[in-house]
């Protein structure tokens, strides 16, 4: 239910105007924001300049005649208190304090400064930070990263770490990860993780939430906010510092209480959030949640091009808590009519290398493979291992691109059927050798990845990442069924 608090945070993410205090013509917030849609409602504040990036620079925010909703305070920590005081006098709704040098230092001076900042802001202005990157919102133009796409999406991101927040921006294009709203909130002297969870839970533009957290001073409230949010939309959560050593680092990073790994795992499970293990898992799972339905069970089928991969995939799936059930006799019979028998393992995983390399003149039948597998009731997820670029280039030479597109488009027709008609989770792997100096291989790999992503399919660089993502998606389906009370096998 939307409240006045929702409206308050909505105004922060969607300000009518904004200012950068401590703006500079060099790299920084000013350079980023002048390239977004908020540029015409952006004010520069720095007494050392008369003009910054073609815009008038004011000595103080109090000198700006226009009303301002939001300001980025990009000055050294010792100047922050004065800047916030002027923002309060100006009547701003909220500020983001970028500077570090507060409680995260562990020094008495920084701790004292943070307490002074919290006391100053309380009841007078909403504050994000300090020690954080702030807000990225394509809809309003707020941003801290010039690499961001500014393309509106449905993924909400809450990160206590500024670097992890930026990673979501850096991988937006390559992972087809479209973001609605993102916040890096740092030391959280005022606005904290529960505030942003509750806001994104009610945000109509956000369908899935990625959360990175290191610690909190509001454990009970966080649990309540997580439960409320996860009850409305999926939340994938990564806790930094679940070991003793990691907890020590997490506490010193943002000054928050880290807690024990067991305590956090219990809270995530009871609230209905999906706990993941690393930043790759967080991004991979979030992308899958934003584009695909969770599987109805743990049965996985894989279409690959190698008997060796078939064996390894089966092991990996079982270790991840999944199952690799065999096809029914009826399905095997139907597959034999389509898949060349020679060199093929007619089982699950389906080692169908000849379909990738030698299928010619009847490629439309490739989609039927997915229709047959999708009809198997004990199969809930399908992984297409499309890591064949090197072999296709070697076999087809200059015609590899044309052959690849024909085969890929027919495979994708089957993938769409499995996802849209049969309700299966479909993931695709496209491997790109990071060290290759073969330009044709590189171009074809990027082409294939983009083609698959254009159809809304999550694409991963490794089989391990795809299988781990299926496992997390299955866990989410279990969480939805039992409200977070049960344990997930595996």
Where are these regions (language model features)?
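Catalytic-core regions of core metabolic enzymes
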Residues: 1-490
